[in-house]
Amino acid sequence: MNDSDETAFRSTRIPADQVRARMLRAAREVISAHGLTVGFAHLPMEEYIRLAAVPRSSVYRIWSTREEFVADLIGEIFVADRFADGADPDAQRAMTEVYERSSAHLGTAVGRRQVAWEMIRIGANSSVETLRASVDWSSYNALLACTFSMEEGPAREAVRATARRLETMLSQRLRDYYQDVLDQFSASLRPGFTTLQLAHLTAIVTDGLVHRGRLLDDELDAVVTAPGLDGEPVEWSLTAWTIRSIVDGMLEPVAEDEPPADR
């Protein structure tokens, strides 16, 4: 923006709330296409000023430093973005479809457990594919990586507060989803385990394997062959099999000879 542009903007007197909204909108549009990177070095205020078509002087009256702008922007991104809505809706939809087409197996605890394993197999695969292609997920992980690497100050505290809020929200939503599934299957966890622990563990497994799969895809894309819903061998991704193993270890076992449940 040159001096004549700045003079023209002064004459229009854009209100501060509009300047703020335009700047954040311009930045969000860029980030929605390209994502965040660790360190936030790719967030150029001058470029956003140009895209937003607002006076530079007005921008720096709102945010005296780039760090203040970044902190404000981070909060805005992760309040409004789709990714902040919780667990992967595609995975949950796929798992629901497995449940709905498996009514013949739901009459016994053993059958319900088999359906649960199939839901994990299909749902975990869906989550992996979604995360691999998700700009939002990459941005979220960049946010987490920066929470301890930024210099001390208000900007770092604001970023950490956003990361903590998001991590808590996502974990609690996944916890609630797991509790709903346990209730649906008339299942319970062994004493000492909680659905919040389960939410943390499954998220860590999925995130970790997807991250490492970007470097070691030939190894981490390997599949495990094991019985599926009907007892026939099917392919399990490492993510799905690991999550199944975690869930199996945390669930109360079922009796093989339990009579059919009333329906």
Where are the model-predicted features located?
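Amphipathic alpha-helical packing segments from all-alpha helical-bundle domains
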Residues: R113-T130, S134-S186
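Solvent-exposed, amphipathic alpha-helical segments
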Residues: A26-H34, H105, L201-R212
